[in-house]
């Protein structure tokens, strides 16, 4: 009974502060914008959208523009050696980036690419990060600095 109360208290505390790793709305806004249907099912830490007829269609993260995506993962699945039954929200950046220049750096790099002197393309990457905090199996708070992307942009 005490363990149940402790879990409820922890969930309440985590839901009050979004930087602690739990957000009540587990669905990222960009995911909702990308999908025209609403029912989502969690499968081993990845979100798989479903239509009414149970036909599975995967989101095309790389087909859209660069944006922030979310996965709800068990802490153990992060692969960082922590023992915890908690789940955290891991945010990452994915999507395509236009070739057009937005900064002086991008302008020069595009020109060098055109001459064959630089390689690659602009890529979607985090522009800022957020810490993730969770309760481990020993009932100690663990904070993982800069684990999750907080914002995305095109670079390179």
Curated annotation (Swiss-Prot):
Organism of this sequence: Mus musculus (Mouse)
Assembly and binders: Homodimer; disulfide-linked. Interacts with GFRA4 coreceptor and RET: forms a 2:2:2 ternary complex composed of PSPN ligand, GFRA4 and RET receptor.
Phenotype of the disrupted gene, per the record: Mice show normal development and behavior, but are hypersensitive to focal cerebral ischemia or stroke.
InterPro entries: Cystine-knot_cytokine (IPR029034), GDNF_fam (IPR043401), TGF-b_C (IPR001839)
Domain of life: Eukaryota
Protein name per UniProt: Persephin
Role of this protein: Growth factor that exhibits neurotrophic activity on mesencephalic dopaminergic and motor neurons. Acts by binding to its coreceptor, GFRA4, leading to autophosphorylation and activation of the RET receptor.
One GO term of the biological process aspect: branching involved in ureteric bud morphogenesis
Signal peptide: 1-21
Disulfide bonds: 66-124, 93-152, 97-154
Gene Ontology CC: extracellular space
This protein's encoding gene: Pspn
Assigned keywords, A-Z: Disulfide bond, Growth factor, Secreted, Signal
UniProt subcellular location: Secreted
Family indicated by similarity: Belongs to the TGF-beta family. GDNF subfamily.
Classification via SUPFAM superfamilies: Cystine-knot cytokines
Gene Ontology MF annotations: glial cell-derived neurotrophic factor receptor binding; growth factor activity; receptor tyrosine kinase binding; signaling receptor binding
PANTHER family: GDNF SUBFAMILY OF TGF-BETA FAMILY, PERSEPHIN
